[in-house]
Amino acid sequence: HLETIQLMNRIAEKFAVTLNVLLEVNTGRNRAGLDPGQPVLDFYQAIRDLEFIRNRGLMAWEGHTATIADPDEKVRSISASMEKLSATVSLCRENGIPIEIISGGGSGTYTISSNFKLLTEIQAGGVIFTDVAYSKWGAETRPSLFLRSLVTSRPSPKRIITDTGWKTLPGWSVAPKPLGIDAVDSVSFSSEHGTIHLAKENTSLRPGDPLDYMVGYGDNTVFLHERLY
């Protein structure tokens, strides 16, 4: 918004600093950002004389494509977003607006977005850990985010209860994956308990035994913990 960046300019002037900014382009996520093309150019021209704002370039996030399961459809959708961003970059440069940084691509799209030779910066964050979600969404990094729980109860040979509920391991977006157990049928969570349902009997795990989960979605898990080991 124009009034927001004008306020940023006044604050920067007060503290005698220059702010580096990227304008966000809405390439299909429909969450924030300017529409591609002429609206971006118009905005740049409206703020180009702000003394304490340094325009560095553009950013976009094709997050609406991250969870697309069909590989061909995912490539097509990301291509459409990249084309909008590329056309906007070209329009700005043709009108004398320097575009130094072009930022985009996320943990669920970087393997495709990076192939377009457009982006100067990849925004992927969660993929440094890789959880169940990003593994499903095409991340190629090795999973490295796990949570250790304890078995608290064995009500039956086909059911395992752990001390891991929503307070430590959220499961409402993407379910965490129990490790080292065969024939897991499903997992469910309440506030303070995790329940693992098995397709066949397992009598080896007993109360007090450790059991590791691969985190379902790091974004809604990491902030709950003060320390990573």
Language model features by range: what are they?
Residues 1-5, 107-108:
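Short beta->alpha connector loops
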Residues 3-11, 15-16:
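Active-site-adjacent beta->alpha loops and helix N-cap segments on the catalytic face
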Residues 19-20, 26-139:
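Active-site loop/helix belt of alpha/beta enzymes
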Residues 76, 108-182:
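Active-site loop ensemble at the mouth of alpha/beta enzyme cores that anchors a bound cofactor
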Residues 81, 140-142, 184-188:
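Short Gly/Pro-enriched turn/cap motifs at secondary-structure boundaries
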Residues 155-229:
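C-terminal accessory subdomain/extension
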